[in-house]
């Protein structure tokens, strides 16, 4: 597991180059609310956010929310904030992730799909500033237990879930990358359960899994949390199965996105990601 420890440079661009820059822009526009008192990730975060949608708020009254003092039901305290609603709580927030007006969204998507821009590779990426491997993943309170993963639907979900993910896999036959948005349930300090069969024919990651299963090999996967909105937006988009979402993200931004090599699996990942969880998905089922 690796993560970035940097702060936003505040660099101005048409589309935010990373998640920190996006949050800074939202805050400057009054679209991000910071909650600094203790908030329980298991029982309070998502009910507070959902209240904006079911409690009578108009869309232009909704805000993204950053919880900076996160605790768990077992007495856990976390030094990582949780951000909710910062990608698509409103049309305006979504459009700000692309650096365009709401009226330009459809045009920008069509341009990006028709004219993708290939990513560029970089070394010494921000996402590798902090790397956690080996025994540090399985010790008490280590690994995934360091992350304040919330319960999305208290009373219904069987586990805390990462939701706004970018799950990176690669076709073992063609080498084509896929980036999908799949919920990842926390099972242990070093284990997540990821559901990739999210469409009738199988999502891109699931089709890759089927190929690895035929090869009798586990599937390398990198789960990205917190990166440039244009990268996240490609995950749930229904693109051609052999189209590289990272290139489409470049088309959305109007410039190449930065990628780097993962530390433990043969995949390229967003270089400016906040958190990357690397691992293998078992195919011996």
Regions of interest found by a model, annotated:
Residues 2-285:
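Extended, highly charged
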């Amino acid at each position: 597991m690796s993560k970035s420890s940097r702060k936003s440079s505040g660099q101005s661009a048409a589309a935010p180059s990373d998640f920190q820059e996006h949050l800074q822009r939202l805050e400057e526009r009054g679209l991000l609310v910071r909650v600094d008192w203790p908030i329980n990730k298991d029982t309070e975060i998502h009910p507070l956010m959902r209240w904006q949608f079911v409690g009578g708020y108009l869309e232009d009254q909704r805000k993204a929310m950053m919880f900076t003092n996160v605790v768990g039901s077992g007495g856990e305290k976390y030094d990582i904030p949780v951000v909710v609603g910062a990608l698509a709580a409103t049309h305006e927030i979504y459009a700000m992730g692309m650096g365009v007006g709401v009226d330009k969204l459809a045009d920008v998507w069509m341009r990006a799909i028709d004219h993708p821009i290939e990513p560029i590779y970089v070394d010494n990426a921000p996402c590798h500033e902090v790397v956690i491997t080996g025994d540090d993943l399985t010790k008490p309170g280590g690994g995934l237990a360091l992350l304040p993963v919330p319960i999305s639907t208290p009373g219904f979900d069987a586990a805390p879930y990462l939701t706004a993910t970018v799950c990176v896999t690669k076709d073992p036959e063609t080498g084509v990358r896929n980036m999908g948005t799949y919920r990842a349930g926390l099972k242990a300090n070093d284990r997540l359960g990821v559901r990739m069969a999210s469409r009738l024919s199988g999502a891109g990651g699931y089709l890759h899994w089927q190929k690895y299963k035929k090869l009798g090999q586990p599937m390398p996967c990198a789960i990205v949390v917190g990166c440039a909105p244009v990268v996240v937006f490609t995950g749930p988009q229904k693109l051609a199965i052999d189209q590289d979402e990272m290139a489409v993200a470049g088309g959305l931004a109007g410039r190449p996105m930065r990628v780097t090599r993962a530390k433990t699996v043969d995949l390229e990942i967003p270089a400016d990601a906040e958190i990357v969880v690397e691992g293998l998905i078992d195919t011996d089922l």
